[in-house]
Amino acid sequence: MDCYAEELVVPNYQESSSETYPSTGMWGGWSMSSPEAAEKCFDYDGFNGEGMMYSQMSMRTSEEEEESKRSKAFYGASSLHDFEGIEQMDDMFLSSILEDVPEDDGDVHRATSSNNSVGSSSMYGGGREVPMFHCHDMSFKEEAPFTISDLSEENMLDSNYGDELSSEEFVLQDLQRASQKLTDETRKCFRDTFYRLARSSQDKSDSVSPNSEELLMQTSRYDYGDGNRFSREEEIESETNSIDRAVANLTFNKMESNISNFPLSERVQ
């Protein structure tokens, strides 16, 4: 029969025991599995002859200690295994990301565990080398440098650019550029040539026109009031010569070919 002494529950089989500590066979009575010790569990330390009993309360049972030892052993043994599992999950996540990136030009590669391979890296964890995946930078097509000269060439090659300047302006610019390269004697020669060619073409047109007499009267009337022009026309030969024909051939017959062969970038400055 159990007895109660100062809120201490003592099993009945401990009343006749003279031993200070309970035996190993009686340890089951102190466990949490026994109905007597469902609420409290004590470690019986000693009992003297004068009736003084010393006890020490402990909140840790043998099962808790064993569970603690097992958990420590489990976590100590599986720490590396857990790291490998996390590492495997990271690799799966990174590989799923790499699968979404297009690999048309071979710009995306997986790094190998070799330290000599270019673009690969690794980390050390748990005493072992763990390979990591890397995404190389996507290579883009290099564009040609854009300069101001390219812009000017594009503007000149534009089809709408020819509408801004008329043919007379092009001819005037060409004549100005050509006259700057000629000497004074050459410019005078060209001037006289153009006068003779113009007068020769006018004489031919007057001979064909039915109202040639009226045109001659008008021209003579205009020439009578202009003494400088009349004196200059006297110096000009009335008939064309070989130089005039050469200039006419160079100017009129070869004009289209010369304009097409002449660089457009030099024609407009």
UniProtKB/Swiss-Prot annotation:
Quaternary structure and interacting proteins, as annotated: Interacts with REV8.
User: Out of the domains of life, which is the source?
Assistant: Eukaryota
One GO BP annotation is:
regulation of DNA-templated transcription
Tell me what induces its expression: Repressed by members of the TOC1/PRR1 family of clock genes.
This protein's name: Protein LNK3
Gene symbol? Answer: LNK3
What is the deletion mutant like? No effect on circadian clock.
Keyword Iron-sulfur annotated: no
Lineage, please?
Answer: Eukaryota, Viridiplantae, Streptophyta, Embryophyta, Tracheophyta
Q: Which residues form a coiled coil?
A: none
Keywords of this entry: Activator, Transcription, Transcription regulation
The role this protein plays is:
Probable transcriptional coactivator.
